[in-house]
Amino acid sequence: MSDSLRIIFAGTPDFAARHLDALLTSGHNIVGVFTQPDRPAGRGKKLMPSPVKVLAEEKGLPVFQPVSLRPQENQHLVADLHADVMVVVAYGLILPKAVLDMPRLGCINVHGSLLPRWRGAAPIQRSLWAGDAETGVTIMQMDVGLDTGDMLYKLACPITAEDTSGSLYNKLAELGPQGLITTLKQLADGTATPEAQNEALVTHAEKLSKEEARIDWSLSAAQLERCIRAFNPWPMSWLEIDGQPVKVWQASVIEDATQSLPGTILAATKQGIQVATGKGILNLLSLQPAGKKAMSAQDLLNSRREWFIPGNRLA
């Protein structure tokens, strides 16, 4: 292709690998791949390569795994590749200004939200958590700030009432490569039109924690149901019963008003375990006790009915 670009790709997880895969068939020249160092994983804590490294090595691409890009010798790794552009997708390392300025067309990033909404670490989860009607991907020109650069291209997708972070992740992993390939074409032929982010519309997608995922019964049933979908597959919403954590995979909202204190078990039937919240009733449908597989409320009641006596309160 005549407008082929020399591209450095920087990314680490599966989400990034899907973008690298799309680039490999786009006609551009991938001159190097940067990814995080191998990390211990699994029960044996064996060093495991990132999904991006696995794909890059499979395709015979040069792979670089610096712990940081701050040292000058590591910055030379980037400079020596003489790239037109660096594509960054969920890389996990900060790019110093010296690196951002090295490629002729700078560095571009695929971000999992419609910027300036949800800058930061957990945009997919926060869009669900907040009850947003849509999300998408933004391809942006990187600068030294956190997701503050000019926007080059956006693609939106609706958020459904069934979406979890897992399903939304897959949708955006399809959209991202489309937006990336389009943006690279525009950069190559000089038609890209950068648009500054409106600072008045900025929201921040804070990292998730296991403690935040603990169910707080004082919240509304609607908010809790969104949390359950937002925190799936990680860190998973959970509650504590008899000193052990029980994950909640699925729930529904019953809008009925209740005078019972938040956390009070109102009913436990094959239709679900109904619990009073700060507003409305949360109907627990699928749960997972520690060391067990996820199961329906009915199956859990068959073995642990004493956990869910109506009138008792969950912590």
Swiss-Prot record:
It is an enzyme of class 2 (transferase). CDD domains: FMT_core_Met-tRNA-FMT_N, Met_tRNA_FMT_C. Its EC number is 2.1.2.9. Keywords: Protein biosynthesis, Transferase. (6S)-5,6,7,8-tetrahydrofolate binds at S113, L114, L115, P116. The keyword Transferase applies. One of its GO terms (molecular function) is methionyl-tRNA formyltransferase activity. Signal peptide: none annotated. It catalyses: L-methionyl-tRNA(fMet) + (6R)-10-formyltetrahydrofolate = N-formyl-L-methionyl-tRNA(fMet) + (6S)-5,6,7,8-tetrahydrofolate + H(+). The keyword Transferase applies. Residues 210-315 are annotated as: C-terminal domain. Attaches a formyl group to the free amino group of methionyl-tRNA(fMet). The formyl group appears to play a dual role in the initiator identity of N-formylmethionyl-tRNA by promoting its recognition by IF2 and preventing the misappropriation of this tRNA by the elongation apparatus. NCBIfam families: fmt. This is Methionyl-tRNA formyltransferase. The gene is fmt.
